[in-house]
Amino acid sequence: MKQTKTKYGKMKQIASNLKLPDYRYEQLTKAIFHQRIDNFHDMHILPKALRIALVNEFGKNVSSVTPIFSQDSKQAQKLLFELTDGERIEAVGLKYKQGWESFCISSQCGCSFGCRFCATGSAGFKRNLTADEITDQLLYFYFNDHRLNSISFMGMGEAFANPELFDAVKILTDQNLFGLSQRRITISTIGIIPGIQRLTKEFPQVNLAFSLHSPFESQRSDLMPINKRFPLNEVMKTLDEHIIHTGRRVFIAYIMLEGINDSKEHAEAIIGLLRNRGSWEHLYHIDLIPYNSTDKTTFKFQSSSAIKQFCSTLKKASISATVRTQFGSEISAACGQLCYENEL
């Protein structure tokens, strides 16, 4: 990552151009990440010349995303952010009873992959987010006194389709910035093989989630056109390599669509897909997700009893599986529901 590519590199360069000692940049990052100061004018520990230069470069605020709409439910908050060019993205904060806070952030404005059950793609693809725009979603929550316990790239867009993703992860794991452990971060993918391979090499401890949704190649290609480019069989081989290299569990997301992918044959095919892969096969975990309805798709919600039966079939075959407990569906903040066209 080039030093001046992200805002933090630019901040360091600005201090250097002013011929200030290195500790001034350290004071700046501490003001952001220890004192949670979002306004450069309020960073009184910094020389006035540096504060003015920072405002001239970035504007008065550290964060570049502006919240313009918010919806809350009992355990979820969905925020609509506007970017400096007027584009919009959504992010979701989740709060659990134990006090744990998790945040689902976006990596793209819209999505180009056209998964039939997902509302995000209906808005079309606008552009990739920069590394700063990705991480600034979290800065907003942090500046508003939230605890960044865990992060998931499960918002709008396919994370591995955005080259800026890895710079964003570097920022998140930099001990002088966000300082997050790799194991507190989860990246979800529809199966972009080069992205999985790069993650394996560069961030082996980051959690990986793979969106399966059908164990049959032809049906998966129909539901998820990306399967024609990266067939399931090839993706699974790549996931095997990831597990062998990292020793880490891979989560396989499976949205339950009534009458589409919920049959006994589907369960048996999943069992066949995960069996006899090798000594590491126990590190695959199936995450069954109740479908969240939207006005953008025509699929139907599967009953909880049917989902539990599907899960039971997998478990009887010694497949690790659970049914995901979801929050935020009532405010369209759950899996597959993010679509900023619904707002305002």
Swiss-Prot record:
Cofactor annotation comment: Binds 1 [4Fe-4S] cluster. The cluster is coordinated with 3 cysteines and an exchangeable S-adenosyl-L-methionine.
Molecular function GO terms recorded: 4 iron, 4 sulfur cluster binding; metal ion binding; rRNA (adenine) methyltransferase activity; rRNA binding
EC identifiers of the protein: 2.1.1.224
Binding site for [4Fe-4S] cluster: C111, C115, C118
Keyword terms, alphabetized: 4Fe-4S, Antibiotic resistance, Cytoplasm, Disulfide bond, Iron, Iron-sulfur, Metal-binding, Methyltransferase, rRNA processing, S-adenosyl-L-methionine, Transferase
Domain named Radical SAM core: residues: 97-330
Cofactor section: [4Fe-4S] cluster
Entry's localization field: Cytoplasm
Binding site residues for S-adenosyl-L-methionine: G157, E158, S188, S211, L212, H213, N292
Catalytically driven reaction(s): adenosine(2503) in 23S rRNA + 2 reduced [2Fe-2S]-[ferredoxin] + 2 S-adenosyl-L-methionine = 8-methyladenosine(2503) in 23S rRNA + 5'-deoxyadenosine + L-methionine + 2 oxidized [2Fe-2S]-[ferredoxin] + S-adenosyl-L-homocysteine
One of the record's GO cellular component terms: cytoplasm
Family matches, as InterPro entries: Aldolase_TIM, Methyltransferase_A, rRNA_lsu_MeTfrase_Cfr, rRNA_lsu_MTrfase_RlmN/Cfr, rSAM
Pfam hit, one: Radical_SAM
S-S bridge residues: C104-C335
Active site: E90, C335
BP terms from Gene Ontology: response to antibiotic; rRNA base methylation; tRNA methylation
SUPFAM superfamilies in alphabetical order: Radical SAM enzymes
Gene3D superfamilies: 1.10.150.530, Aldolase class I (3.20.20.70)
UniProt enzyme class: transferase
Family in the record: Belongs to the radical SAM superfamily. RlmN family. Cfr subfamily.
Additional comment: Reaction proceeds by a ping-pong mechanism involving intermediate methylation of a conserved cysteine residue.
Protein role: Specifically methylates position 8 of adenine 2503 in 23S rRNA. Confers resistance to some classes of antibiotics.
HAMAP family per the UniProt record, alphabetical: 23SrRNA_methyltr_Cfr
Name under which the protein is recorded: Ribosomal RNA large subunit methyltransferase Cfr
Natural source organism: Clostridium botulinum (strain Hall / ATCC 3502 / NCTC 13319 / Type A)
